[in-house]
């Protein structure tokens, strides 16, 4: 049986940097923390925390999420387990929800170690939307707001902004792509 190499950029390329450099994400996390912005954190196993970033330790790649800004009831979120960081608009009502840290950080899937910079950058430059297929089954669509080696920023149709980590993506296409 012959092995066929996939050369399609929508499946990504092998990451040049491993482990991931979360410095750009760290800047965004600090901004969200200082401005008490409500966030939705989605893990690689589709567990969801809706709350605030109470504290952040960039050296340990660790977010402490809480149900209140700078709150004391804190859940540890490892950046290595984070699939999506979504900023929620202040106009909508959300139910705050926390899950135990061991459930959130459980790695059900192996990180892809893939880099989707090429397809995301191409869509960004062409002004077309992207469609992101997550390993755990969710499909996201929106317009890219920027990309680096480990994540892509996406503005969704409801106006929310999210950072999607490449390690938990199985494929990214342009939103106008049809199979």
Swiss-Prot record:
It holds the Pfam family Flag1_repress. Transmembrane segments: none annotated. One of its GO terms (molecular function) is DNA binding. InterPro entries: Flag1_repressor (IPR003223). Keywords: DNA-binding, Repressor, Transcription, Transcription regulation. It comes from the Bacteria. Transcriptional repressor of the FliC phase-1 flagellin. This is Repressor of phase 1 flagellin gene.
């Amino acid at each position: 049986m012959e092995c066929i190499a996939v050369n399609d950029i929508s499946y990504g390329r092998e990451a040049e940097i491993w482990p991931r450099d979360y410095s750009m994400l760290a800047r965004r996390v600090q901004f969200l923390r200082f401005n008490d912005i409500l966030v939705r954190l989605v893990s690689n196993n589709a567990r969801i925390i809706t709350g605030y970033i109470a504290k952040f330790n960039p050296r340990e790649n660790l977010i402490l999420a809480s149900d209140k800004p700078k709150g004391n009831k804190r859940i540890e979120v490892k950046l290595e387990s984070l699939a999506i960081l979504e900023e929620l608009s202040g106009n909508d009502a959300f139910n705050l929800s926390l899950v135990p840290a061991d459930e959130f950080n459980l790695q059900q899937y192996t990180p892809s170690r893939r880099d989707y910079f090429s397809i995301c950058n191409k869509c960004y430059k062409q002004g077309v939307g992207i469609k992101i297929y997550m390993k755990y089954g969710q499909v996201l669509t929106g317009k890219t707001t920027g990309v680096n080696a480990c994540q892509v920023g996406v503005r969704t149709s409801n106006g929310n902004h999210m950072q999607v980590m490449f390690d938990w993506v199985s494929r990214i296409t342009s939103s106008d792509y049809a199979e």
